[in-house]
């Protein structure tokens, strides 16, 4: 086991995938000689050659269209969409073709689409968005997002090995979090984890908001409030068994994500909890997310993003019922 950043863990996972399977191909904007804008693919083109790690034009729809063609020819493409806000030109290819191909033709498309996403990095417009709900809603796609270096390595391995398309959302603000990883550890798609045990309130988060939820749990403990944090890891398929096991214990739930609350992914989680645990809940399920406005300029993003205080306030409100 060694301590590496999430960025390095993803790089190592890609390197190991390229080594173990000659059909794995990596491509996207600046992923070759430059190694990507975040240097996630640093050194891979030099190690594996331009035929397996290559740059593309600035055309996201074409990037995904090429991935479809390569997958149909027996390859395992791993295209990168450089930033979250650049994925929309590829939306038609992903939703109309990538997601539907297996049901339409019986042919699997083993495509893993890597997408750096979410905010809190002081970026400009189109570089800090949270489009995960669009794709989690789309039948035929698997959607995952790690919050730790170890999960990033293992989930990416699982995604590349999967016979069906996976969108792999990478929380940019977590790229330089450093932790020990075990390359032999396996994390199957569709399995959440208990990131912090507690008994008073369940806080459900994923990707970039897991760290905020853990900070809130630590702050709450100082006030003798016990928060359990669930890291979803996988949005589709969604592991409701782990979520419900926690809610049955705490009888209260708060869902946190960076995307706007209105029609955000948290609405699905909250609806499922409310339906399946109606007789157990001692408070309404709370949702915390970004404001219902386009992602703001960098100087205002701290006002937009969920923070520890908002989570603690929701936990206090939940505990105040009954």
Name what the model sees in each region.
Residues 1-165, 169, 303, ...:
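Thiamine diphosphate
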């Amino acid at each position: 086991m060694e301590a590496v950043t999430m960025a390095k863990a993803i790089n190592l996972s890609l390197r190991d995938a390229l080594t173990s399977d000659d059909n794995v191909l990596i491509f996207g904007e600046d992923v070759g000689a430059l190694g990507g804008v975040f240097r996630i693919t640093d050194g891979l083109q030099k190690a594996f050659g331009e035929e397996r790690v290559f740059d593309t034009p600035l055309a996201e729809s074409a990037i995904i269209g090429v991935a479809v063609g390569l997958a149909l020819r027996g390859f395992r493409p791993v295209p990168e969409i450089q930033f979250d806000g650049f994925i929309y030109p590829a939306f038609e290819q992903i939703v109309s073709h990538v997601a539907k191909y297996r049901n339409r033709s019986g042919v699997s498309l083993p495509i893993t689409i890597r997408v750096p996403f979410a905010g809190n990095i002081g970026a400009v417009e189109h570089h800090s968005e949270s489009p995960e709900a669009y794709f989690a809603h789309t039948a035929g796609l698997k959607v995952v997002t790690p919050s730790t270096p170890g999960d990033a390595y293992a989930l990416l391995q699982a995604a590349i090995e999967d016979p069906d398309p996976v969108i792999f959302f990478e929380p940019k603000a977590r790229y330089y979090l450093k932790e020990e990883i075990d390359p032999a550890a396996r994390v199957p798609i569709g399995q959440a984890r208990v990131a912090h045990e507690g008994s008073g309130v369940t806080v459900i988060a994923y990707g970039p908001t897991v760290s905020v939820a853990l900070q809130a749990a630590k702050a709450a403990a100082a006030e003798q409030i016990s928060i359990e944090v669930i890291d979803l890891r996988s949005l589709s398929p969604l592991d409701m068994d782990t979520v419900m096991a926690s809610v049955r214990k705490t009888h209260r739930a708060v869902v946190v994500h960076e995307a706007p609350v209105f029609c955000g992914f948290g609405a699905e989680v909250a609806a499922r909890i409310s339906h399946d645990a109606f007789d157990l809940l001692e408070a309404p399920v709370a949702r915390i997310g970004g404001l219902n406005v386009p992602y703001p300029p960098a100087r205002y993003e701290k006002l937009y993003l969920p923070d520890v205080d908002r989570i603690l306030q929701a936990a206090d409100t939940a505990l105040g019922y009954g």
